[in-house]
């Protein structure tokens, strides 16, 4: 993980304020600054514009505690959407029958948090074999989905990875998104590590296919010099998550609920309370600047290439895969 002086200052200030920002009415600054910095990040990393709060659509971003939380939110939201949709088209089936048929997909190179999300969601996740280059592609996903559909199972979500833990491999988002659209399967992209490189034009290929994904997460506490915990998550249609997680007791209601420009982020996450994480992001960006953060990422990539050359010159070592970003 990474950190920096501005981030530490922001963390101290947030702790001092003691904000529990589960809704706008609790702390307007907490909610509104998070909306601002999530759109800043979206402009900085350049995923599709529909992920911004400022867009005309229902998309937007939220800060989760970790990639594990972001993936779990996506898996649970996709599950509830699939159950509602399938029961509408198959009213003869009970809810328990539908839930018993659900299945999800990911690569055998994906992070352990994805498999854990399946356990917590009570939904099996099939870990599909990646190719020799450690990449999961659409034809592999298609074969698995067709097999499950033939067996009466209900495909729900595919969790792809940009920057796998073992080799920093990048799943083929373009081919996976085409298959997911065909079978109406939610596509989530876990870019916890590689997402920081979206900001570099020389790494723009990593952004291919993101215009067709449903949700995306990226850890600022990796490349962005923001201390743990701080994981950005963007949703193409935030209403799908809100509809899945909305538990609105009378003591949580306020008169400004439902206004598009002031979201209640408690509906976008697992816990009720939430920390003022946006403050350390804001201070870090204001202090270091976009170009300073880009140069930090570039420096990591350059150091990895230098280390790779040292390894290649030493016969005692063997590279499992070519270096990618900061991983050798």
Curated annotation (Swiss-Prot):
The organism's place on the tree of life at top rank: Eukaryota
Transmembrane annotation, as ranges: none
Q: Which residues carry this modification: N6-(pyridoxal phosphate)lysine?
A: 222
A Pfam entry, by short name: Pyridoxal_deC
Q: Which GO terms describe its cellular component?
A: cytoplasm
Q: Where is the active site?
A: 111
Q: What is its EC number?
A: 4.1.1.107
From the UniProt record, list the reaction(s) this protein catalyses: L-dopa + O2 + H2O + H(+) = 3,4-dihydroxyphenylacetaldehyde + H2O2 + NH4(+) + CO2
Which UniProt key words apply to this protein?
Answer: Catecholamine metabolism, Cuticle, Lyase, Pyridoxal phosphate
GO biological process terms on file: amino acid metabolic process; carboxylic acid metabolic process; catecholamine metabolic process; chitin-based cuticle development; cuticle development
Single GO molecular function: 3,4-dihydroxyphenylacetaldehyde synthase activity
What InterPro entries has UniProt attached to this entry? Aromatic_deC, PyrdxlP-dep_de-COase, PyrdxlP-dep_Trfase, PyrdxlP-dep_Trfase_major, PyrdxlP-dep_Trfase_small, Pyridoxal-P_BS
Q: Which cofactor does it need?
A: pyridoxal 5'-phosphate
Q: Which family does it belong to?
A: Belongs to the group II decarboxylase family.
Q: Which PANTHER family match?
A: 3,4-DIHYDROXYPHENYLACETALDEHYDE SYNTHASE (PTHR11999:SF60), GROUP II PYRIDOXAL-5-PHOSPHATE DECARBOXYLASE (PTHR11999)
Instruction: Give the protein's function.
Output: Involved in cuticle development. Probably responsible for the protein cross-linking during the development of flexible cuticles.
Could you tell me what this protein is called?
3,4-dihydroxyphenylacetaldehyde synthase 2
Lineage here is:
Eukaryota, Metazoa, Ecdysozoa, Arthropoda, Hexapoda
